[in-house]
UniProtKB/Swiss-Prot annotation:
Pfam families named in the record: F-box, LRR_At5g56370
Gene3D superfamilies referenced in this protein's UniProt entry, alphabetically: 1.20.1280.50, Ribonuclease Inhibitor
Cystines in this chain: none
Protein name: F-box/LRR-repeat protein At1g55660
Annotated source species: Arabidopsis thaliana (Mouse-ear cress)
């Protein structure tokens, strides 16, 4: 019990100390030590040296725990402090590379560093790998780099959580290795923006529990169905669609699913939604594809606004933002929901009874 209390406190203290120590070291020291700076700040260097000598006496396990509280960039920069620290960061269970507004040369340097860091990573498994690249020079980090990093994370490091966000990254959506669809270790998968979801015929994701698909592109209309059909323990699914992404009718048939969030806005296309998830407890649908009541495609009986919900006996909470009129068909199978939030973008006189609701919010 004593260790359970003292270790988090010690980690918090050392993390604050590291932040201060790293603040004494200029950013260019990550690439090359500047001798003139060392001369002009000899006192600070001595302070850092004395503190590091004391900290370095701690066991590796505790030091790695401390480093895990720092950003990956700061954790890596500690490798220059002494030989004792040179490879400690390679045992980090979580790696996060978040870059924006990078030049061609910076992007190329980042690509080399990330490749080498994944190749020499020593932890038995990567608990979390996050790669986020935004507003960089297109072509500086290539799609083949992303392909390689995901392959290394899957084959070498048994990654458990993978998060990819690629914005303003390449002219075409980035393709991921098919091995990702057969990764037995992955529990959380988040894909966002310029990524191609190309699902092979053989898929096996036995551990995947959380899936986030944000504004991605699908290789064909059945890609999502093949993916979801092979996630036997999936519990949380989030989808955001705001473009032509090659999906037609959306089928969410996952017996284990407990939470579903679906957000759609123009110009994404949908030929209807079919859902059969008897374990569902929370459902959120934001459908903003209509701009006005005068829209040429505002016919609520059109297949593109047809929602086929199977019975959801365990549904406890639902949150809807809708812009089409025929809502009675929409709510036919969820009248047993206990907590409902409803925001309508159109006027309707239809009456719907929710016999089991104990909390109801309606906005228009």
């Amino acid at each position: 019990m004593f260790l359970c209390v003292i270790i988090p406190c010690l980690c918090s203290y050392l993390c604050s100390l590291f932040s201060w120590l790293l603040g004494q070291i200029p950013s260019f020291l990550f690439d090359k030590i500047n001798e003139s700076w060392l001369t002009s700040t000899k006192r600070n260097v001595e302070i850092v040296k004395n503190l590091m000598d004391k900290i370095s006496q701690l066991p590796d396990e505790l030091l790695v725990k401390v480093l895990s509280f720092l950003s990956t960039k700061d954790a890596v920069s500690t490798s220059i402090l002494s030989m004792r620290w040179k490879s400690l960061w390679m045992w980090l269970p979580k790696l996060e590379y978040n870059f924006r507004h990078y030049s061609v040369s910076e992007g190329q340097g980042l690509a080399r560093f990330i490749t080498s860091s994944l190749r020499v990573h020593k932890a038995p498994a990567i608990e979390s790998l996050s790669l986020k690249f935004r507003y960089g020079a297109i072509g500086s980090i290539k799609p083949k780099d992303i392909y390689l990093w995901v392959s290394l994370a899957v084959h070498v490091s048994n990654v458990r959580e993978l998060s990819l966000k690629l914005f303003n990254f390449a002219e075409l959506p980035t393709k991921l290795p098919k091995s990702l669809c057969k990764c037995k270790s992955i529990v959380i998968l988040k894909l966002k923006d310029e990524i191609l979801v190309d699902v092979p015929r053989k898929v096996c994701l036995p551990s995947l529990k959380t899936l986030f698909l944000g504004r991605v592109t699908y290789s064909d209309a059945n890609s999502l169905h093949r993916l979801l059909s092979n996630c036997p323990v999936l519990e949380d699914l989030v989808m955001e669609r705001d473009k032509i992404d090659n999906l037609g009718k959306l089928s969410v048939i996952v017996k284990s699913l407990q939470r579903l969030t679906l957000k759609m806005s123009r110009p994404c296309h949908l030929d209807g939604l079919k859902m059969n998830s008897p374990s569902l407890k929370y459902l959120k649908v934001i459908d903003e594809r209509l701009e006005s009541d005068s829209d040429d495609e505002s016919d609520s009986d059109s297949p593109r606004y047809f929602y086929d919900f199977e019975d959801m006996p365990k549904l406890e909470e639902a949150d809807f933002v809708l812009t089409f009129q025929n809502i009675k068909k929409f709510f036919g199978s969820i009248t047993s929901v206990k907590r409902l939030s409803l925001c309508l973008g159109v006027y309707t006189e239809e009456v719907i009874c929710f016999h089991h609701s104990i909390h109801l919010i309606v906005e228009q």
